[in-house]
Curated annotation (Swiss-Prot):
Residues modified to Phosphothreonine: T92, T104
Gene: SAP30L
Tissue expression notes: Detected in brain and ovary, and at lower levels in heart, small intestine, lung, kidney, skeletal muscle, stomach and spleen (at protein level). Ubiquitous; expressed in all tissues tested with highest levels in testis.
Official protein name in the record: Histone deacetylase complex subunit SAP30L
Positions bearing the Glycyl lysine isopeptide (Lys-Gly) (interchain with G-Cter in SUMO2) cross-link: K49, K155, K166, K175
Keyword Zinc-finger: yes
A GO CC term attached to the entry: Sin3-type complex
A GO molecular-function annotation: transcription coregulator activity
Amino acid sequence: MNGFSTEEDSREGPPAAPAAAAPGYGQSCCLIEDGERCVRPAGNASFSKRVQKSISQKKLKLDIDKSVRHLYICDFHKNFIQSVRNKRKRKTSDDGGDSPEHDTDIPEVDLFQLQVNTLRRYKRHYKLQTRPGFNKAQLAETVSRHFRNIPVNEKETLAYFIYMVKSNKSRLDQKSEGGKQLE
C-alpha cells in the first residue's frame, strides 16, 4: 500500500461511462493548488482520506475541487504528496539548525531490517528503558525514536559500528566469550 487507494476504494456515486473504462481518461486532476485548479491529466492515483489526512498534517495548500465527480489526481501531485510524506522533519537545535546534521533531506533509516540481536545490542549500549518482552517491531520503533534524537552524524556512526562488528573489536563480543580475546 502506498497511501493511494484504488479506484474501487475512492469512487463515490455512479461512475460515468468513459471513466469506468479507464481511470482518469479524459479527466483532469481533481486538486486545487494555491486557489487554482490543476489542469494536468488525471492518472490512476486517487485522493483518499488517508492522503487527505497527510496533506492536512503537513499543512500543504492542496484541496479537492468539490465540483468534480472523480477523485483522481495527476502524477505530479501523486509524486509530490509521496515525497512530502516520506520526508522526515527533523528537530532543529538551539544553534539555529543550519548545520549539516540538521538537513531535512536526510532519508529515514529503516532499523526494522536489522536483526533482533542487533536492536537489543543497541538498546543495551544506550541503556534504553523498555518493558520486557518487546517484539521486533516495538524494539525497532523504540531504537528508531532514540536514533533520530541523538545529535550525531548518522552516516559516520553506522560506518564505525559496521567496522567494529566486522573487525571483531566489539567489547560486547569479548565479554560474551568469557574473557578470551577474539582475533
